[in-house]
Amino acid sequence: MRFHRQGTAATVGVLLIVLLGFCWKLSESYGIVSTALPHKQPATKITDTPSIRWDNYHEFVRDIDFDNSTAIFNSIRAALRQSPSDIHPVGVSYFPAVIPKGTLMYHAGSKVPTTFEWLAMDHEFSYSFGLRSPSYGRKSLERRHGRFGNGTHGDHPKGPPPPPPPDEKDRGSQKMLTYRAARDLNKFLYLDGASAAKTDSGEMDTQLMLSNVIKEKLNLTDDGENERMAERLYAARICKWGKPFGLDGIIRVEVGFEVVLCDFSADNVELVSMLEMVQPNQYLGLPAPTVISKEEGWPLDENGNLVEDQLTDDQKAILEREDGWEKTFSNFNAVKSFNQLRAGTAHDNGEHRIHIDYRYLVSGINRTYIAPDPNNRRLLDEGMTWEKQLDMVDDLEKALEVGFDATQSMDWQLAFDELVLKFAPLLKSVSNILNSNGDINESIAINATALTLNFCLRFEPASNNSDEFGSGKDFAVYQYVSPYQALKTDADFLIWSSAVSVVGEIVDAIYKVNDLLIPEVYSFMTDNTTSSDLIKNVETARSTIDGLIESLGWIELNYRCERQCNWDEVCYTPSWGPSPMGMTEPGSHNEGFGTHFDESRQRLVINSKLQCININDLMVNRNH
């Protein structure tokens, strides 16, 4: 009996070991894991989804129409790019952004910031803003027409700078500060479009919406709403709201990209340089400008203008000398401003020191109806109810709780750039053929299908092709939108679904043109004739392609520099708001350089033909 009990126990033990081993193997094979979250694991943890393949990708597409898809697509492509952000100025999205450790940023002002303040990504931006040279001679009588600003990279009030003080010694010294990111600043919100435009036509809606919601959420009843400049009020509220979430600040575009940094503590940035800015007249050892006033014996009328025929010989000599100095300094100041333009233009293709984590994009698109025209839409439209605004801010808070890591995000901008590089030349070439001058004949069909057939045959299956492999239009779409990283968040799926929609429309259009015109080519090749429907088919094909090009709204298809610019020129895209080329107000009928008033939109828009400009153009524009 003892032997039997021992044998039974041994047998049971062996069976238990085998059973445990089998369960372990089963869990390994089928991915059985605990559903409980680890200690302090956030509920917002993202997880991988099943692989998206050619035969199942439709199952993962989110519900988004073509207009919203193009809006998402173009917002992604314009992100952190200066020229596209000005061409498509009304942004409606918040992009999570990271400024890596070691990145240098700049500020020009009279003191070291102790609260939130503006920093520039380019030193030319801060230098141009901060170095405000005194005027000499007759120019000193004029109110200096400087850039409007809110203290961007400095601490000047909004509006034109005041007239120069009567004495050089009374001018407050300006400091040029250089900061270095002490860590990865991984909780920035980049506001797309021309978000530093200082306008009321929609460009600043992302800040206004956030400010309004914050006011109610934090019960900010006495924060100087009526006394403070709008964007300083927005910045103060946003930083106050974001502090519990670790918000580093916001990023906007003006002429170059600027950062509103919420906290200048050593944990975030370190001050690596602080220079007193030297005026050119000081550097050259020239005296301060002569004070031209009645008190100093100068003949001035009631409007403060010189009475030229009452000038003494000494006064004439002073003016002749100082007017000459002013002419020289005007060249210096023009180059200073042009350098800012050049630095900004360098980011037309991207501000690559800032990285975007697209996984946590928060956008007004697809939440309510937003007009697809980025020149004529508003985030704060009637469809954006208070409840929807609260939902957007709630999504921002959830994203900030997680923090951003661009290395874990698919680079959607890169993926979309590839699509445009592939399809823009094809679509434009087909359009040019279909819009050829002269009579419609078989050559149009032959030339157009030479392009479309090469595309379609790539995906055409042989008669004995197995259904095991993808083919046709469906596979064509999949080939171009197949993600190279797993989609993990709602934003990922929304962005990818937008790509599916956009590429689907493009593929459909290419196939439609091919199906319309190939029979005409076949008829001409076999019978040396075309059908009576040739003209109608070409016109249908033309309207299909041209309508698609208009609906896509791709900048490359509509905007181009007039020529290859010379080394001393930049291809200038007008900006909205402060600029060395002057302040451009979207709602004005006064056309600024490179803009025109669009009657249908009732606002200024940027001309499709961009111009090369140099320092002389800047000086001429300033004098008008």
UniProtKB/Swiss-Prot annotation:
One of its GO terms (cellular component) is extracellular region. Residues 1-29 form the signal peptide. The keyword Secreted applies. It is found in: Secreted. It comes from the Eukaryota. Glycans are attached at N68, N150, N219, N366, N441, N447, N464, N528. This is Uncharacterized protein YOR389W. It comes from Saccharomyces cerevisiae (strain ATCC 204508 / S288c). The lineage of its organism: Eukaryota, Fungi, Dikarya, Ascomycota, Saccharomycotina.
